[in-house]
């Protein structure tokens, strides 16, 4: 679109790109990704997807999670509370209608997970990659006889969940601070939930095998992930003109699977049900986060500056988050939410 990747990044970090121009620049990158991902025949599309899946099976279990934690997840809790909804859900929310607020959409998403994962009172539940614990706390409050365990590799997240559970006087919550790829246990769980976490895995076959060892014959595994309806891709730069992908996520951190790719990983589990959620739900989520950030921008700066040390560092973080939200809207609203979307699959142990 005329400017080099370096020029665009230079202008972006100086605050010289208005939102409307930024939307066009990002949309151009998604146009290019679509052109790259779709093949001229179904035979070539299938071969392309199978090559990608074969490549995943030859990799280590996960991507560069530590790098991503530092850059994306270890922001002050007060900042996260200012930007996200009441449960600090940093994944797709579910908007039941045009008037749904972000708080209502967070709750509706948790409700949908419980319905599709067939959560019932009295079960043991493990939430892998549990974030700030919104789903853990939702289940623990709603199903008083469930014992809910959250697993996170962020100490800040683990501390936050423990504090919230204490505040809510919940005695049926545990938090495990661990990297899931290195963690192991002899325990089994009635339900295992993996919400927008499998994107950080590479060798999904190894990951699913590990999860299956924590399941009994009656256990169910519910996986929710960002997807494209047709093709797989790493969230990495296509070429030197792609300034956007590497700015949003460090290389090697995020893989976006197609909506059917997990069906190729049934060595240790078997799919029972399969759903997709239109991408506009994610588009509306990131748009709500951006609006909340813009509305509380001065307070957000004050929260961030002590930890980051300078106004320049604060500006960089805010630019990154706003670009993530604007880019996410362009991605998930593409073709009215019928390109990138959320896929959900329910598995049982084989």
UniProtKB/Swiss-Prot annotation:
Catalytic activity: (S)-stylopine + S-adenosyl-L-methionine = (S)-cis-N-methylstylopine + S-adenosyl-L-homocysteine; (S)-tetrahydropalmatine + S-adenosyl-L-methionine = (S)-cis-N-methyltetrahydropalmatine + S-adenosyl-L-homocysteine; (S)-canadine + S-adenosyl-L-methionine = (S)-cis-N-methylcanadine + S-adenosyl-L-homocysteine; (S)-scoulerine + S-adenosyl-L-methionine = (S)-cis-N-methylscoulerine + S-adenosyl-L-homocysteine
GO biological process, one term: methylation
Swiss-Prot/TrEMBL keywords: Cytoplasm, Methyltransferase, S-adenosyl-L-methionine, Transferase
EC number(s) from the headed UniProt entry: 2.1.1.122
GO cellular component: cytoplasm
Localization, UniProt: Cytoplasm
Keyword presence, Methyltransferase: yes
Molecular function per GO: (S)-tetrahydroprotoberberine N-methyltransferase activity
Binding site for S-adenosyl-L-methionine: 91, 129, 153, 157, 179-180, 195
Activity-pH behavior: Optimum pH is 8.
Catalytic residues (UniProt): 325
Induction description: Up-regulated 2 hours after elicitor treatment.
Pathway given in the UniProt record: Alkaloid biosynthesis
Family matches, as InterPro entries: SAM-dependent_MTases_sf
Subunit structure: Homodimer.
Name of the protein in question: (S)-tetrahydroprotoberberine N-methyltransferase
């Amino acid at each position: 679109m005329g400017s080099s990747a370096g020029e665009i990044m230079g202008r972006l970090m100086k605050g010289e790109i208005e939102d409307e121009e930024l939307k066009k620049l990002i949309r151009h990158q998604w146009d290019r990704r679509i052109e790259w991902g779709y093949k001229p025949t179904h035979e070539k599309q299938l071969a392309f997807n199978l090559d990608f899946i074969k490549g995943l099976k030859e990799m280590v279990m996960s991507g560069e999670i530590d790098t991503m934690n530092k850059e994306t997840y270890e922001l002050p809790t007060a900042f996260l509370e200012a930007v996200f909804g009441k449960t600090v859900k940093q994944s797709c929310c579910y908007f039941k209608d045009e008037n749904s607020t972000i708080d209502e959409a967070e709750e509706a998403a948790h409700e949908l997970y419980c319905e599709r994962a067939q959560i019932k009172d009295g079960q043991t539940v493990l939430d892998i990659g549990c974030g700030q614990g919104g789903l853990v706390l939702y289940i623990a409050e709603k199903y008083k006889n469930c014992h809910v365990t959250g697993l996170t590799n962020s100490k800040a997240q683990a501390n936050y969940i423990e504090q919230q559970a204490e505040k809510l006087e919940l005695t049926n919550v545990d938090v495990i601070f661990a990297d899931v790829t290195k963690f192991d246990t002899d325990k089994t769980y009635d339900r295992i939930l993996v919400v927008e976490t499998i994107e950080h895995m590479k060798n999904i076959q190894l990951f699913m095998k590990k999860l299956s060892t924590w399941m009994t014959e009656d256990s169910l595994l519910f996986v929710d992930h960002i997807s494209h309806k047709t093709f797989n891709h790493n969230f990495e730069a296509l070429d030197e003109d792609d300034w956007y992908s590497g700015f949003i996520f460090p290389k090697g951190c995020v893989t976006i699977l197609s909506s059917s790719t997990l069906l190729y990983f049934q060595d240790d589990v078997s799919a029972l049900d399969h759903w997709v959620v239109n991408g506009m739900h994610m588009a509306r989520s990131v748009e709500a986060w951006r609006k909340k950030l813009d509305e509380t921008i001065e307070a957000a700066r004050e929260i961030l500056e002590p930890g980051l040390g300078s106004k320049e560092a604060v500006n960089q973080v805010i630019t990154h988050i706003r670009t993530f939200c604007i880019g996410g809207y362009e991605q998930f609203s593409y073709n009215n939410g019928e390109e990138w979307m959320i896929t959900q699959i329910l598995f049982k142990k084989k």
